[in-house]
Amino acid sequence: MKALKIHGAGHMTTEQVPVPEPGVGEVRVRMQYGGICGSDLHYFFEGRNGEFEVLEPFTPGHEMSGVVDLDPSGRLAAGTPVAIAPATYGTPEAGIEDRRHLWPGGTYFGSASTRPHTQGGMQEYRVVQDFMIRPLPEGLATDAAALAEPLAVALHALRMAGGVAGRTVLVTGCGPIGLCVAAACAAQGAARVDATDALEGPLDRARSVGAATTYRAGVDDVPATAYDTVFECSGAAPAVSQALRSVRRAGTVAQVGMLPDQPVGVNLAPFVSKEVTFTGCFRFDDEIDEAIELLAAHPEIARVITHVIPADRVQEAFDIARDSQQSGKVVVSLWLDS
């Protein structure tokens, strides 16, 4: 079978590897679609994602969907369309028993955080543990289902912020995660969703998924002390300062975008003087089930996907995904004609 392999910065190949055999408690999935995440971009273009360096060839991809190929238990028929929950969980820790995604020792598809690295899903077949399988509801196509994982990240952020129904919301940073956050807020009854970004392309896409008013960062004046909840999705220090400036007194800022693992210059004065609740948001726990339901109920969320590109043009796919002016979520189709 074919599999994409990242060897280091700028070096990715398509290789022939053996078709894996599922064991007890496992299912073999014919992978069909994989979304390109920011971590995939870091691994390919830089050879590392933060502190996690590519030290051996590994397959990227954790935003995955496909169809069941073989379930030895007989529970799932071949051809059943599914999305994949890409995490395994580590050892429970006191105080976070209800936050499995924070337990130490877990793994995540397509990650160099462990050695050996955890292989991802951008290959023709992938054996997964049966608890990772999420059958899709009727009418939800597997290409759109590649959004289940990033939408779950967005829904986890909404949960961490205490929900958005009836609230005014600002989203800073309209890359794929920011777009998923904006779409989720609109679908879940926010009174108003506004958005900021440094580029016009992402703002166009934000309006297409429910943003009412958009602001060019560094060009337009963004309202101050105006929003019940701000979701900071860029991971840029100036946007963190903007989020704290724009949130109302006693409001909530949810930090969704990953920040660099080093000191950054952020104006924290509003955090103190307005008694802002500032919460971090990391991956998700069980929100992927809600994400799948939301995708089925709100097909407009699939507008977050701007490109579907065959795996034989994967270099082009990664180049487009890196260009946030022209692309939202870029999805790779995995040799569907083979």
Regions found by a protein language model. Name each.
Residues 63, 80-81, 102, 125, ...:
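Residue-level marker of beta-strand positions
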Residues 1, 285-338:
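C-terminal hydrophobic helical "lid"/dimerization subdomain
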Residues 252, 265-304:
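Rossmann-fold dehydrogenase core element
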Residues 198-199, 259, 284:
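Residues in the short beta-alpha loop(s) of Rossmann-like NAD(P)-binding domains
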Residues 20-34, 48-96, 137-139:
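Glycine-rich beta-strand-centered segment in the early N-terminal region that forms part
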Residues 161-162, 203-277, 337:
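Glycine-rich cofactor phosphate-binding loops and adjacent beta1-alpha1 units
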Residues 79, 131, 137-219:
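Mid-domain Rossmann-like dinucleotide-binding core that forms the NAD(H)/NADP(H) cofactor-binding site
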Residues 5-21, 38-65, 83-88, 103-117:
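N-terminal glycine-rich cofactor-binding segment
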